[in-house]
Swiss-Prot record:
Taxon lineage: Eukaryota, Viridiplantae, Streptophyta, Embryophyta, Tracheophyta
Protein name (database record): Light-independent protochlorophyllide reductase subunit B
Family listed: Belongs to the ChlB/BchB/BchZ family.
Subunit structure: Protochlorophyllide reductase is composed of three subunits; ChlL, ChlN and ChlB. Forms a heterotetramer of two ChlB and two ChlN subunits.
InterPro entries: ChlB/BchB/BchZ (IPR050152)
Cofactor note: Binds 1 [4Fe-4S] cluster per heterodimer. The cluster is bound at the heterodimer interface by residues from both subunits.
UniProt organism field: Stangeria eriopus
Function of the protein: Component of the dark-operative protochlorophyllide reductase (DPOR) that uses Mg-ATP and reduced ferredoxin to reduce ring D of protochlorophyllide (Pchlide) to form chlorophyllide a (Chlide). This reaction is light-independent. The NB-protein (ChlN-ChlB) is the catalytic component of the complex.
């Protein structure tokens, strides 16, 4: 988060941190998806 803030990049969602099913609707609106661990979210990021 700090690195992205320092680069003046707005964070849309951090999943699963405090996320809900309702929040998931905004995920496709992102310009890009950052996946820090490919084992966990690569397929999801590719889908989005």
């Amino acid at each position: 988060r700090r690195l992205l803030r320092d680069l003046d990049i707005k964070i849309n969602q951090v999943i699963p941190e405090g996320g809900s099913v309702k929040d998931l609707k905004s995920l496709p609106k992102a310009w890009f998806t950052l996946v820090p661990y490919s084992e966990v979210g690569l397929m999801t990021a590719m889908y989005l």
